[in-house]
Curated annotation (Swiss-Prot):
Keyword terms, alphabetized: Fimbrium, Signal
Family: Belongs to the CsgA/CsgB family.
Induction: Constitutively expressed in agar-grown cells (at protein level), part of the csgBAC (agfBAC) operon.
NCBIfam families for the chain: PRK10101.1
Organism for this UniProt entry: Salmonella enteritidis
Location relative to the cell: Fimbrium
Function: Curlin is the structural subunit of the curli. Curli are coiled surface structures that assemble preferentially at growth temperatures below 37 degrees Celsius. Curli can bind to fibronectin. The minor subunit is the nucleation component of curlin monomers.
Domain of life per record: Bacteria
Name this polypeptide is given: Minor curlin subunit
Amino acid sequence: MKNKLLFMMLTILGAPGIATATNYDLARSEYNFAVNELSKSSFNQAAIIGQVGTDNSARVRQEGSKLLSVISQEGGNNRAKVDQAGNYNFAYIEQTGNANDASISQSAYGNSAAIIQKGSGNKANITQYGTQKTAVVVQKQSHMAIRVTQR
């Protein structure tokens, strides 16, 4: 487990601007955790991914400065994707349950977005093109879908 975690951390740190975590583990459920902090030329980008369960996947792409992304997944078959560009943007995805799908896309300056999914089969998408926008989506049931676009 320690060698697997070390290899994963070195792989993630070697890819500037991209963090990916998956837990396609055939053994019992474990807690997977990845942190990628990119401080090259004061970019100060950080991606934090925590996973418990099976077949969860998380992907983060950051291009800009002062960017923070946090993804927490518990359950199975959850998918999370964060795409950040610009400056001072914050994205948070929390998934508890199974087969949830969440994505956040941010550009420009000073945006905050959060998706919280507690249930199964939910889909949520937040897209922020403007400056200093805030969006929060909470899905507490199953099979719900929402798309938020802020310009």
